[in-house]
């Protein structure tokens, strides 16, 4: 009989968001007239920018003309898109990133999991706690962990607690670790990292031969000019970091799918024989074998993000969601809750009222206010007693959700 990958059996009962969906669906079936407002999963609600739509429509027409038809594209992405990304997102910020070091993909979630294909099974891996669950679950699937304890912490991972006391920014690990996951602006806490903080991580990684996986999916929400948007703004990062980015939240591509991973050609890791190997070559080989590239139509839409019209429209989308975050943050704070994040970030991290666990308060908000949030414990043991609120929704829904909470859950 065929056998399975037994590491999947170590995963907790359900990925966080499917469990949320199960509870919401059960409630909706029991209360079909309830008007549920979803402020849980970070899916956007506003339409694609007009510049992107126009470019994609033209690209569709290109595909209908023999002279401009495109078949298989380059696995790494079309050069015209990679050049635009390199110039606007990196070079204009002083980052020495070349278009050849950029890999266009269909999602940063995919890339943060797939990147493990090119790394060995004997690496020590560090994650913050709480943390985006994909970082942990993909390592479990790959066989990099032992079993989980009662708190959901997996043996073999190094957990770095982030709390209100440390500003939700992790301290350097006391032990040597090989692979480090960092996400700023952070999901789920909404915390941001200063240049000095990231410099500490870069210095640690270079001193220990570590590699940082830097998730910058929410960098567009940074409005503070003193905060870095990319790990490559930090001296030395080219030799120790891989960066992941996405068009999902800034340009509304959650249903269109386009992202990118930056792998500097100066980044190396050791082979079993002790020789140093270029990570870029391994990732290029992996993508060429397992990935056929993002569609021409979608890449033309992503390219339009960097047009003057696209830049203005993306700025408008980001400002819209940041205003939602401000409303959420201020309303929940006025309701007596301890609130974090929501500044330079689209997520608000909130302490549950005394006596409530994360899931208990999730259920209370769902059943009493018909509002869906994300329980903090789903992001790790240190997330217990918190919940995450997403700013990705319509203004009317955000205001209505806050009104319901204010009226029905006055503390």
Swiss-Prot record:
Species of provenance: Cyanothece sp. (strain PCC 7425 / ATCC 29141)
A GO biological-process term: lysine biosynthetic process via diaminopimelate, diaminopimelate-aminotransferase pathway
Gene Ontology MF annotations: L,L-diaminopimelate aminotransferase activity; pyridoxal phosphate binding
Sites bearing N6-(pyridoxal phosphate)lysine, chain numbering: 249
UniProt EC number: 2.6.1.83
Disulphide bond pairs: none
Database matches in HAMAP family: DapL_aminotrans_1
Binding site for pyridoxal 5'-phosphate: 72, 108-109, 132, 187, 218, 246-248, 257, 292
UniProt-annotated binding residues for substrate: 15, 42, 109, 132, 187, 292, 388
Keyword terms, alphabetized: Aminotransferase, Pyridoxal phosphate, Transferase
Similarity comment: family membership: Belongs to the class-I pyridoxal-phosphate-dependent aminotransferase family. LL-diaminopimelate aminotransferase subfamily.
Required cofactor(s): pyridoxal 5'-phosphate
Record protein name field: LL-diaminopimelate aminotransferase
Catalytic activity: (2S,6S)-2,6-diaminopimelate + 2-oxoglutarate = (S)-2,3,4,5-tetrahydrodipicolinate + L-glutamate + H2O + H(+)
Pathway field: Amino-acid biosynthesis; L-lysine biosynthesis via DAP pathway; LL-2,6-diaminopimelate from (S)-tetrahydrodipicolinate (aminotransferase route): step 1/1
Cited function: Involved in the synthesis of meso-diaminopimelate (m-DAP or DL-DAP), required for both lysine and peptidoglycan biosynthesis. Catalyzes the direct conversion of tetrahydrodipicolinate to LL-diaminopimelate.
Subunit structure: Homodimer.
């Amino acid at each position: 009989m065929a056998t399975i990958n037994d590491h999947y059996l170590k995963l907790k009962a359900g990925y966080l968001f499917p469990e949320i969906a199960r509870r919401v669906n059960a409630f909706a079936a029991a209360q079909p007239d309830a008007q549920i407002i979803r402020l849980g999963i970070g899916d956007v609600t506003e339409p694609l920018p007009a510049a992107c739509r126009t470019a994609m429509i033209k690209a569709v027409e290109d595909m209908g003309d023999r002279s401009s038809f495109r078949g298989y594209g380059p696995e790494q992405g079309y050069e015209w898109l990679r050049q635009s990304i390199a110039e606007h997102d990196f070079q204009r910020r002083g980052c020495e990133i070349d278009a050849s070091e950029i890999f266009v993909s269909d999602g940063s979630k995919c890339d943060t999991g797939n990147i493990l294909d090119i790394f060995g099974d004997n690496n020590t891996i560090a994650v913050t706690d709480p943390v985006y669950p994909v970082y942990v679950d993909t390592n479990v699937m790959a066989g990099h962990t032992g079993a989980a304890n009662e708190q959901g912490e997996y043996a073999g991972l190094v957990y770095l607690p982030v709390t209100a006391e440390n500003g939700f920014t992790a301290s350097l690990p006391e032990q040597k670790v090989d692979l480090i996951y960092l996400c700023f602006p952070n999901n789920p806490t909404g915390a941001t990292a200063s240049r000095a903080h990231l410099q500490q991580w870069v210095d640690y990684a270079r001193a220990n031969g570590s590699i940082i996986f830097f998730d910058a999916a929410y960098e567009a929400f940074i409005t503070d000019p003193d905060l870095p948007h990319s790990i490559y703004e930090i001296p030395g990062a080219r030799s120790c970091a891989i960066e992941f980015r996405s068009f999902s939240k800034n340009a509304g591509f959650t249903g269109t799918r386009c992202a990118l991973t930056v792998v500097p050609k100066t980044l190396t890791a050791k082979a079993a024989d002790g020789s140093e190997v270029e990570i870029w070559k391994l990732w290029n080989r992996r993508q060429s074998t397992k990935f056929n590239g993002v569609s021409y139509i979608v890449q033309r839409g992503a390219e339009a993000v960097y047009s003057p019209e696209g830049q203005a429209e993306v700025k408008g989308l980001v400002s819209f969601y940041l205003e939602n975050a401000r409303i959420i943050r201020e309303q929940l704070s006025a309701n007596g809750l301890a609130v974090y994040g929501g500044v330079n970030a689209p997520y608000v991290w909130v302490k549950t009222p005394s006596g409530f666990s994360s899931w208990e308060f999730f259920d209370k908000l769902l059943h009493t206010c018909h509002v869906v949030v994300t329980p903090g414990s789903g992001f790790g043991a240190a997330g217990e007693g918190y919940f995450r609120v997403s700013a990705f929704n319509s203004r009317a829904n955000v205001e209505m959700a806050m009104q319901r909470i204010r009226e029905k859950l006055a503390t």
